[in-house]
């Protein structure tokens, strides 16, 4: 048996790889094993399976999403632990890049083989490998693997089923504490009986939980005050006293409501206490550091350790330590919506059901808020790791927002035209360009994304040539710019998507709707959205705040916030004047009578225009420039690029006079339908696959064209505007012909022009339908039921899934971070907040 297959078998025996993982399938390749291991998560779990607590998994990033920085950190943690706790020699270890870049996967197999022969591993009773004489480094098998590895592959969620979950441990402690005395159940329970059980469980678990908070205060806080400093007490117990006070009152009102006829006022208690439960925001954001500080104090001081054991004995006969009990409040606040969900299910009266659903929504919102606090704590840990590794950084990285992507690239700039190897960290607000020095990074430049835009450039791309895939990062004023080069086209696409997402977070759609000026903002206190009244989630940059009136809002709610009360009274008039001024400027340009020029050589601001002139004008070959200032004896002209509507200066030797070419014969193309009405297009496309399209000549105006495309079960129509010999569907970009326009949108999503149309032009309507569905259909993905979106949700990251109210989402799994599910809609896959959807919604219609 090949050595890598023996290694796979050993990893399965060690309970690291699932027995059914695709690496075990017939026809599996070694690159699939490399892909499974290269983020370092499973390797760290392997050491813990062989030697419990060998690695503190809180120091491991369990969801690195192929961030090179985080993956390498995980791999190096594995390697150092192999030496320190398993006795492997340095010569037996692979280098971190041998795995991450798959430069020498044979050496990785060699290290795992050496690990399998260590006494610790053999004590587990698992057969080491190789079990027969085999070559430990088969160059034929392992050579060329780096070219087969996919840097853009999505995480295989099933892989992480074998990874320890601290949340699951906390859940077990909670369940043990809340276990109810068994009550005999009737042989056949009615819906009324089930409802009574739900009500009883809500009351009894609340009583037990409030007792637990009281026990922490009575048996741990008070005795430890004589041993610990006030700051230690505050760090460890956070606001437990406040939680106990809130729940003492909550329990009283809960009992009063349950004692009433039919418990019809129960929902009011939960709605009332949603705001009071916001004290959990502080607790949940600090409980992890509280546990860590408790461990440090107990390790450093034997008297404290002994006192903790004594307190535990008095509180619960030693069953639960203080560290165990500190996890319980986090678990409890995440259970209310589950308890109410069961109660809703078994409530028959329509009015009661609707009222309880209001309470359910309130508790779901609270749970999601808590989950986002936990998620942001993980994000802040990542940011801290970045911060500690970057030298010359003069401010907190958290000020730049959430990390988007990081990795190696090549770069050129206005100052330095030769390609330079760099390592970049992209966050919401900035790109940090660094030089890698071993395990640390030297900051070379910080690019503030507020004043930059991204522009694709595929002119020099070659599929088989690495580092030829490039896009531009250009300053709005043209004084500075960068060319960013990537190893593969897929990697470039991934980075471009993250740049676009970051810029859309800075300048979201509807940021200036209704007179507002919304900007990303970190709220110190837990805050509700002005539009939907749901909580803003997380611990930093939770949403947006209007610069003028201070109104808070979710990204997806910006267009629904009531009008701003703080902008100038002549706000609308100013906008109208600006519009009229622009029209007058356009008319003036047309009356000058200057010729149009065609670009034959690109220009991106190098060399820059003379200082007294103004901003440069970006030019691409084929662009048409309408001159506004031009004199034959001057080398610099001013003009408007009709493809982008930008105005600026450029060297006159990059253009020549524009000459209209002969009309194109469109009938040869499989997408061209000739003269056709909307109804005719709908008749053709209605029963075709999503993504099928045609281009038609408009019957009412034969000089105009339109695209008709099937998307999301509907036929959409897009008008193609023509003027000055150019074709466009948006003011941002123009083309010299229909063919160029169609070819561009075959490769680029229409969402850049129409937010709700996230598709390319995929299948020309004249192609046979069988070819149009030759790709694996989206429906072939295994899913576990569906859910209906109850609210809009706007993705903040390329891993998230934007939703519109009413969307039906296929649920792919619920195993991710708490409060987030993975789903598919319209062929797009990503994560979304579970409280924004209603699962099996048909039951509640």
Curated annotation (Swiss-Prot):
SMART domains (alphabetical): C1, CH, PH, RhoGEF, SH2, SH3
Residues of the DH domain: 194-373
Start and end residues of each SH3 domain: 592-660, 782-842
Domain SH2: 671-765
Modified residues (Phosphotyrosine): 826, 844
The UniProt record lists the keyword Repeat: yes
Outcome when changing residue 529 to S: Abolishes transforming activity
Span of zinc fingers (Phorbol-ester/DAG-type): 515-564
InterPro entries: CAMSAP-like_CH_dom (IPR022613), CH_dom (IPR001715), CH_dom_sf (IPR036872), DBL_dom_sf (IPR035899), DH_dom (IPR000219), GDS_CDC24_CS (IPR001331), PE/DAG-bd (IPR002219), PH-like_dom_sf (IPR011993)
GO BP term, pick one: G protein-coupled receptor signaling pathway
Any one GO MF annotation of this record: zinc ion binding
Pfam families linked to this entry: C1_1, CAMSAP_CH, PH, RhoGEF, SH2, SH3_1
Keyword vocabulary terms for this entry: Guanine-nucleotide releasing factor, Metal-binding, Phosphoprotein, Proto-oncogene, Repeat, SH2 domain, SH3 domain, Zinc, Zinc-finger
CDD domains xrefs: C1_VAV1, CH_VAV1, PH_Vav, RhoGEF, SH2_Vav1, SH3_VAV1_1, SH3_VAV1_2
Superkingdom in the source lineage: Eukaryota
Limits of the PH domain: 402-504
Record-annotated Calponin-homology (CH) domain positions: 1-119
Domains: entry comment: The DH domain is involved in interaction with CCPG1.
Role: Couples tyrosine kinase signals with the activation of the Rho/Rac GTPases, thus leading to cell differentiation and/or proliferation.
Protein name: Proto-oncogene vav
Taxonomic source organism: Mus musculus (Mouse)
């Amino acid at each position: 048996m090949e050595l890598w297959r023996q290694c796979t078998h050993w990893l399965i025996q060690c309970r690291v790889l699932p027995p059914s993982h695709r690496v075990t399938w017939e026809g599996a390749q070694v690159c699939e094993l490399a892909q499974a291991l290269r983020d370092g998560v499973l390797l760290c779990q392997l050491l813990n399976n062989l030697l419990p607590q060998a690695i503190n998994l809180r120091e491991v990033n369990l969801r690195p999403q192929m961030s090179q920085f985080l993956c390498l950190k995980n791999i190096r943690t594995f390697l150092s632990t192999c030496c320190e706790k398993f006795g492997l020699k340095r010569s037996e270890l692979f280098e971190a890049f041998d795995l991450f870049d798959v430069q020498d996967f044979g050496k990785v197999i060699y290290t795992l083989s050496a690990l399998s022969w260590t006494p610790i591993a053999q004590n587990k009773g698992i057969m080491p490998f190789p079990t027969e004489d085999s070559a430990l480094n088969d160059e034929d098998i392992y050579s060329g693997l780096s070219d087969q590895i996919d840097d853009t592959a999505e995480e295989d969620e099933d892989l992480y089923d074998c990874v320890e979950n601290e949340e699951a441990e906390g859940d077990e402690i909670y369940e043990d504490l809340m276990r109810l005395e068994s009550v005999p159940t009737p042989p056949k329970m009615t819906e009324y009986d089930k409802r009574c059980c739900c009500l009883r469980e809500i009351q009894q678990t609340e009583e037990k939980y409030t007792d637990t908070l009281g026990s922490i205060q009575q048996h741990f806080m008070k005795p430890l005050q004589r041993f610990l400093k006030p700051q230690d007490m505050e760090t460890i117990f956070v606001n437990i006293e406040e939680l106990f006070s809130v729940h003492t009152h909550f329990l009283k009102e809960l009992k009063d409501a349950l004692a009433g006829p039919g418990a019809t006022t129960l929902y009011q208690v939960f709605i009332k206490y949603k705001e009071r439960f916001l004290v959990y925001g502080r607790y949940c954001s600090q409980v992890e550091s509280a546990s860590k500080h408790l461990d440090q104090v107990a390790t450093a001081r034997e008297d404290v350790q002994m006192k903790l054991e004594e307190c535990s004995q008095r509180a619960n006969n030693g069953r639960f330590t203080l560290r165990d009990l500190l996890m319980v409040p986090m678990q409890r606040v995440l259970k209310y919506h589950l308890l109410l969900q069961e109660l809703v299910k078994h409530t028959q009266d329509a009015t009661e059901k609707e009222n309880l659903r209001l309470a359910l929504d309130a508790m779901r919102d609270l749970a999601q808020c808590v989950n986002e606090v936990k998620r942001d704590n993980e994000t802040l840990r990542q940011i801290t790791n970045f911060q500690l590794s970057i030298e010359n950084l003069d401010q907190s990285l958290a000020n730049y927002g959430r990390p988007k992507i990081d990795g190696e690239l090549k770069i050129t700039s206005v100052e330095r035209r030769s390609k330079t190897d760099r390592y970049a960290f992209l966050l919401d607000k900035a790109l940090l360009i660094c030089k890698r020095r071993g395990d640390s990074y030297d900051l070379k430049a910080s690019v503030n994304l507020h004043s930059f835009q991204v522009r694709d450039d595929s002119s020099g791309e070659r599929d088989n040539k690495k580092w030829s895939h490039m896009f531009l990062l250009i300053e709005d004023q043209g004084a500075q710019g960068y060319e960013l080069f990537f190893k593969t086209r897929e990697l470039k696409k991934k980075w471009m998507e993250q740049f676009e997402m970051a810029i859309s977070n800075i300048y979201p759609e509807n940021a200036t709707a209704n007179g507002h000026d919304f900007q990303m903002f970190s709220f110190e206190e837990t805050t509700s959205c002005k539009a939907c009244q749901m909580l803003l989630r997380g611990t930093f940059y939770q949403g947006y705040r209007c610069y003028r009136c201070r109104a808070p809002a979710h990204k997806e709610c910006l267009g629904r916030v009531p009008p701003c009360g703080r902008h100038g009274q002549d706000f609308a008039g100013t906008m109208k004047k600006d519009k009229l001024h622009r029209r007058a400027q356009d008319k003036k340009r047309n009356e000058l009578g200057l010729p149009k020029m065609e670009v034959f050589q690109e220009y991106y601001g190098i060399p820059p225009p003379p200082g007294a002139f103004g901003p440069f004008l970006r030019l691409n070959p084929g662009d048409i420039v309408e001159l506004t200032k031009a004199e034959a004896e001057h080398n610099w002209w001013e003009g408007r690029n009709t493809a982008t509507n930008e105005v600026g200066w450029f060297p006159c030797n990059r253009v020549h006079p524009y000459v209209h070419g002969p009309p194109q014969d469109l009938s040869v193309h499989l997408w061209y339908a000739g003269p056709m009405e909307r109804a005719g297009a709908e008749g053709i496309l209605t029963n075709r696959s999503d993504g099928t399209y045609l281009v038609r000549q408009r019957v009412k105006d034969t000089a105009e064209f339109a695209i008709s495309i099937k998307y999301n079960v509907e036929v959409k129509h897009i008008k193609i505007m023509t003027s000055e010999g150019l074709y466009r569907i948006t003011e941002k970009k123009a083309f010299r012909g229909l063919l160029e326009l169609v070819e561009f949108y075959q490769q680029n999503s229409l969402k850049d022009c129409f937010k709700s149309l996230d598709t390319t032009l995929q299948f020309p309507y004249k192609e046979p339908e069988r070819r149009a569905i030759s790709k694996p259909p989206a429906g072939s993905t295994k899913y576990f039921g569906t859910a209906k979106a109850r609210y809009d949700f706007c993705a903040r990251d390329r891993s998230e899934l934007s939703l519109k109210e009413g969307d039906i989402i296929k649920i792919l799994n619920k195993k991710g971070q708490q409060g987030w599910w993975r789903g598919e809609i319209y062929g797009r896959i990503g994560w979304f907040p579970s409280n924004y959807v209603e699962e099996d919604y048909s039951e509640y219609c």
